[in-house]
């Protein structure tokens, strides 16, 4: 062999780069099975690594990213939020009643209800995660509602008639007086989640446990309110103080309310007209909101994807990657980073020209991840020798497309590749000139020159060759072949046979390749094939037998909610012709499907609530009265989303679904009380006193629910962003619907009941 070839030991040419904080690494990724949980798997892996290190002290390893840490931190922040909600709820009860015993009564019902819910969750096979724990936080705010209503009613029956009524009788009578209301309110809250159990897709998978968890909480709280609260009331014998921290404010509000309602009942048309205008205005605000599939929580992780020109030597690529490393390491909020290119690292690019730099920010950083991301984008996307895209990573982003309100994505298809390539290049050129878009790229860009060999099947067949056989022989001559494997000192070493590097390094040398034929002769490659240079993209995608190109970009800070439509009309549409059409992108398609599913669930929930109302009041008229609180809630929901600039997402739509079941509770309390008072009072007096009497329990239940959601509405904790939309929708909706239930609902009650009143009552009201 040594007479005809050079034989030597060597190593394979470097075709990948992997570094952690500037040091070369070998990376191992561990993924859990579907039936395992991250925390258990993480502990097992850590124990295994410690065992290996004990066996070989020279082994050094670093845990680059442990997903279980993110889960643990998210669970911790949600658990802290739940504890805060319980404490604040008890404090609010003390403000209104002035007796710590009253707070303890309601506080006792909370852990009992939570434990019952956890038992039912275990029975259903649910796990504790961000979604289910968030539902427990929401449940804390709602599960005290029934207890507060019962407790407040017990206090009223104790003081009824000016004398002391035996505590036991007051507990029984007080509970019985509001029993129908709390059952109706609980049923309406629960039925809205029935559609969640029936829908499929991502919405059903994610939110079904949330819906069931809240239902479990509400059922447990209802049973607790009917049994535990009156029992504790008799046992503790709390006394409502006349001068509580909130009593003076409540008396002033009730007196002011009576005076205000006297005036509003005389201006029914103005009141109803104003309410309708506000609802219409809220719908206008809704059109100004952005949309996204799911909000990403702040996990402090940024993924930087760097695309280099195809064909670059790995040394040139490494220079670009080192520039990226130097840039991110200058950021004071960076904790560590991992870089991978080629087949190295956790993200294998499989020979493409892309590299991934995953940056992990410090836990005690002074800026949010989005702020760091925007700064890096501004600087890194100016680099001319590569294209850079950045995105923050979310714990919910695993296995799920997270549509973003700032993303641009257009998918064009055509049967003619050349037409599609030309159109995509022109679109990219136009978009790059616009001030409202940046980081524009096409999946057909970064084309690299290559040598293309088109084998003529007829000429090849005449020589006894097939195109496949020609390709195989040319590949072996250009790239070499592994002839055998030697075992040296227990190590397997491949023996590769190849021509010298300069044997076929020009197109002329390729054309001169001589191939053996099946007949024992030979033929030059140029005699059976056309050989020439051609620009080609890294990959060509086809969909339904059509060529496909994806054009992506990012909206700038100056863009608004109408920018996407403008780009569509001003740029994209004019390139759509008979041969080129546009497909709905994956994110938009998924978002539309999930939004449609949740929209149907909301519509079904509204119908189910109406059915429950009709069954409870045995009158469509009273059901319609209660249902008016739902459109009123939209005023606050859309206003809060607009003020915080929170996009409409799956979680915010879930908030609207929950709102359907919660806002009607105040309406139920008011209508039920007004109907009871009409039996003993003048019609006008009954309408006004029903609101004045129910003002305190309405405020208490609304406050406890709202306060429980405030940490989520403020995006508190690592997982705060995930459920912020839901909390904002419910907080805003509850605030406005409570005010509307006290101010507008009495007017609507009079309008709906006016035809059934005798002349004296109508005159008295007007």
Which role does the model predict for each range below?
Residues 139-154, 178-198, 205-244, 357, ...:
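Transmembrane alpha-helices and their membrane-interface boundaries in multi-pass membrane transporters
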Residues 292-362, 417-450:
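Extracytoplasmic/periplasmic
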Residues 64, 71, 75, 151, ...:
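Helix-loop junctions and hydrophobic alpha-helical segments within the transmembrane domains
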Residues 176-178, 231, 245-295, 382:
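Signature of alpha-helical transmembrane segments and their immediate interfacial
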Residues 122-123, 197-205, 276-312, 366, ...:
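Transmembrane helices with small-residue packing motifs
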Residues 316-404, 459-478:
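Solvent-exposed, membrane-proximal periplasmic/extracellular interface segments of envelope transport
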Residues 1-85, 94, 151, 168, ...:
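Extracytoplasmic/periplasmic membrane-proximal domains and adjacent transmembrane bundles
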Residues 87-156, 611-694, 699-716, 732, ...:
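Hydrophobic transmembrane alpha-helices and their membrane-interface caps
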């Amino acid at each position: 062999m040594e007479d005809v070839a050079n034989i030597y030991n060597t190593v394979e040419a470097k075709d990948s780069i992997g570094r952690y904080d500037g040091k070369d690494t070998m990376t191992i990724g561990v993924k859990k099975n579907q039936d395992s949980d991250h925390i258990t798997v993480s502990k097992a892996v850590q124990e295994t690594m410690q065992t290996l290190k004990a066996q070989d002290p020279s082994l050094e390893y670093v845990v680059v990213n442990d997903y279980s840490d993110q889960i643990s931190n998210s669970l911790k922040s949600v658990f802290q939020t739940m504890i805060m909600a319980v404490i604040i709820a008890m404090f609010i009860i003390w403000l209104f009643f002035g007796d710590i015993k009253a707070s303890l009564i309601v506080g006792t019902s909370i852990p009992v209800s939570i434990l019952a819910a956890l038992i039912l969750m275990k029975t259903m096979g649910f796990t504790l995660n961000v979604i289910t724990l968030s539902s427990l936080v929401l449940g804390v705010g709602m599960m005290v509602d029934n207890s507060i209503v019962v407790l407040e009613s017990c206090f009223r029956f104790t003081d009824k008639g000016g004398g002391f009524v035996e505590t036991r009788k007051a507990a029984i009578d007080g509970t019985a007086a509001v029993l129908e209301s709390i059952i109706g309110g609980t049923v309406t809250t629960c039925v809205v989640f029935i559609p969640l159990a029936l829908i499929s897709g991502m919405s059903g998978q994610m939110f079904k446990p949330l819906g069931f968890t809240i239902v479990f909480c509400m059922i447990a709280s209802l049973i607790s309110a009917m049994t535990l609260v009156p029992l504790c009331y008799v046992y503790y014998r709390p006394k409502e103080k006349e001068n509580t921290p909130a009593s003076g404010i409540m008396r002033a509000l009730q007196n002011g309310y009576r005076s205000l309602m006297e005036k509003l009942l005389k201006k029914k048309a103005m009141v109803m007209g104003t309410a309708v205008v506000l609802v219409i205005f809220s719908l206008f605000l809704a059109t100004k909101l952005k949309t996204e599939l799911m909000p990403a929580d702040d996990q402090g992780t940024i993924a930087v994807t760097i695309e280099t020109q195809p064909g670059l030597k790995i040394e040139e690529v490494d220079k670009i990657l080192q520039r990226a490393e130097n840039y991110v390491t200058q950021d004071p909020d960076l904790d560590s980073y991992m870089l991978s290119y080629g087949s190295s690292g956790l993200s294998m690019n499989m020979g493409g020209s892309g590299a991934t730099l995953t940056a992990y920010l410090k836990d005690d950083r002074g800026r949010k991840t989005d702020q760091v991301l925007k700064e890096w984008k501004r600087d890194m996307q100016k680099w001319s020798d590569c294209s850079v895209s950045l995105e923050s990573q979310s714990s919910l982003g695993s296995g799920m497309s997270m549509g973003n309100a700032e993303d641009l994505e257009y998918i064009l298809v055509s049967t003619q590749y050349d037409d599609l390539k030309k159109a995509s290049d022109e679109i990219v050129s136009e978009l790059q000139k616009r001030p409202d878009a940046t980081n524009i790229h096409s999946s057909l860009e970064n084309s690299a020159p290559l040598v293309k060999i088109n084998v003529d099947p007829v000429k090849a067949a005449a020589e006894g060759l097939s195109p496949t056989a020609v390709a195989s022989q040319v590949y072996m001559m250009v790239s070499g072949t592994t002839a055998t494997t030697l075992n040296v000192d227990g190590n397997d070493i491949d023996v590769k046979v190849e021509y010298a590097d300069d044997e076929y390094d020009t197109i002329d040398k390729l054309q001169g390749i001589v191939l053996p034929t099946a007949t024992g002769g030979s033929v030059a490659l140029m005699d059976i094939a056309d050989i020439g240079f051609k620009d080609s993209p890294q990959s060509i995608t086809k969909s339904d037998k059509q060529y496909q190109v994806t054009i992506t970009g990012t909206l700038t800070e100056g863009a608004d909610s109408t920018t996407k439509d403008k780009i569509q009309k001003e740029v994209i549409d004019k390139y759509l012709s008979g041969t080129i059409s546009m497909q709905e992108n994956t994110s938009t398609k998924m978002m539309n499907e999930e939004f449609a599913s949740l929209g149907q669930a909301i519509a079904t929930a509204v119908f189910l609530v109406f059915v429950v109302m009709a069954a409870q009041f045995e009158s469509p008229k009273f059901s319609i009265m209660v249902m008016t609180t739902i459109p009123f809630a939209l005023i606050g929901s859309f206003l809060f989303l607009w003020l915080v600039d929170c996009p409409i997402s799956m979680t915010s739509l879930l908030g609207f679904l929950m709102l359907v079941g919660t806002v009607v509770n105040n309406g139920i309390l008011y209508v039920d009380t007004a109907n009871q008072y009409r039996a003993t009072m003048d019609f006008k007096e009954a309408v006004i006193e029903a609101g004045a009497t129910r003002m305190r329990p309405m405020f208490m239940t609304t406050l406890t629910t709202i306060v429980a959601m405030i940490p989520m509405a403020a995006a508190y904790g690592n997982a705060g962003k995930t459920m912020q939309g839901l909390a904002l929708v419910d907080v805003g909706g509850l605030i406005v619907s409570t005010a509307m239930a006290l101010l507008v609902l009495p007017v609507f009650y009079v309008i709906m009941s006016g035809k059934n009143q005798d002349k004296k009552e109508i005159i008295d009201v007007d």
